[in-house]
Amino acid sequence: MLDEEHGGLGLEQPITTLMAIYEVLGQYGAPTYVLYLLTGYNTIVREGTQEQIDACLKYLGTGEQVVNSACTEPGAGSDVSGLVTTYKRENGKIYLNGTKTFITSSKGVKYLIIMCRDADNPDVISEFFVDMSKPGISLSPL
């Protein structure tokens, strides 16, 4: 849940509140992207750069799906112990290499938070904020 600084309520027990929100949204058949937005925004506000925060929060309240998380992979499902997508740091840049699948409600999102392993140290798992308009990214409907 967002803090007051970013337009939220600044709740003391955001997880309890989030669970209640999910339950009510589910009862009314809310679109799934709403559920992904709630947690995605929280991750971005907590871990993102100011530029990333601003890029996402400008869409807050528009109803547009802006961000989603991608950890599910072919052959591994959502079990992160089976992640094979990797990242490598070279010449001041970070390169991601791998395939994600079944990323629910992600068609048309502007940004994905992609989970992957360090190619040089596979015990390290990180998440990266990826602008989906950048070259080298391809999407395929299932």
Task: Annotate each language-model stretch with its function.
Residues 76-79, 94:
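Hydrophobic, small-residue-rich alpha-helical packing segments that form membrane-like cores
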Residues 3, 21, 49, 69, ...:
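Buried hydrophobic positions in well-ordered alpha/beta secondary-structure cores of metabolic enzymes
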